[in-house]
UniProtKB/Swiss-Prot annotation:
<keyword id="KW-0456">Lyase</keyword>
<comment type="similarity">
    <text>Belongs to the imidazoleglycerol-phosphate dehydratase family.</text>
</comment>
<protein>
    <recommendedName>
        <fullName>Imidazoleglycerol-phosphate dehydratase</fullName>
        <ecNumber>4.2.1.19</ecNumber>
    </recommendedName>
</protein>
<dbReference type="InterPro" id="IPR000807">
    <property type="entry name" value="ImidazoleglycerolP_deHydtase"/>
</dbReference>
<dbReference type="InterPro" id="IPR038494">
    <property type="entry name" value="IGPD_sf"/>
</dbReference>
<dbReference type="GO" id="GO:0004424">
    <property type="term" value="F:imidazoleglycerol-phosphate dehydratase activity"/>
</dbReference>
<keyword id="KW-0368">Histidine biosynthesis</keyword>
<keyword id="KW-0028">Amino-acid biosynthesis</keyword>
<dbReference type="InterPro" id="IPR020565">
    <property type="entry name" value="ImidazoleglycerP_deHydtase_CS"/>
</dbReference>
<dbReference type="Pfam" id="PF00475">
    <property type="entry name" value="IGPD"/>
</dbReference>
<dbReference type="GO" id="GO:0000105">
    <property type="term" value="P:L-histidine biosynthetic process"/>
</dbReference>
<dbReference type="InterPro" id="IPR020568">
    <property type="entry name" value="Ribosomal_Su5_D2-typ_SF"/>
</dbReference>
<comment type="pathway">
    <text>Amino-acid biosynthesis; L-histidine biosynthesis; L-histidine from 5-phospho-alpha-D-ribose 1-diphosphate: step 6/9.</text>
</comment>
<dbReference type="GO" id="GO:0005737">
    <property type="term" value="C:cytoplasm"/>
</dbReference>
<keyword id="KW-0963">Cytoplasm</keyword>
Amino acid sequence: MRTASISRRTAETDVSVSIDLDGTGKATIATSVGFLDHMLELFARHGLFDVTIKVEGDLHVDQHHTTEDTGIALGQAVAKALGDKRGIARYADIHLPMDETLSRIAIDISGRPFLVFRTTFRVEKIGQFDTELVREFFQAFAMNAGITLHVETLYGDNAHHIAESVFKGLARALRKAVAIDPREDGRVPSTKGSL
């Protein structure tokens, strides 16, 4: 079973995450940041990952630490659940439409963390959520999952739709990249023999 649990406690947040990469999309999310909860529920559903996340954060300051630390812990959980990465597809990409928005996401589960994020928002907030925190989440996730992640919104107007397209795109691409390829016959998908 490709599952993992992570607990991460700092002076700013207390985060617990569990994930089953071979789940059915069940989500139990409680970050106390409504928009982030919504995005993480989409991530679980569209990735077909079973995800439980509970966060207590310093929301009296703002939502930054809660969002970033959730990305860190979720990334760590994905990396742990993947183990030595034997048999995975490794690479995946997707174009994800959301009404007037189209985003492109590409992933390499390489062990070399990197983020290219070419998504902009015309507004500073979606409800009470700072739009700049979308990038902060993706940065934290990619660095801690150990993946190369390219995120680009080709076009779009509505900030909610843009955020939704990149979170759903991440989920759908990650779902394909972590999938077991039976032709790999349990090998690590690299000429080096490790990732």
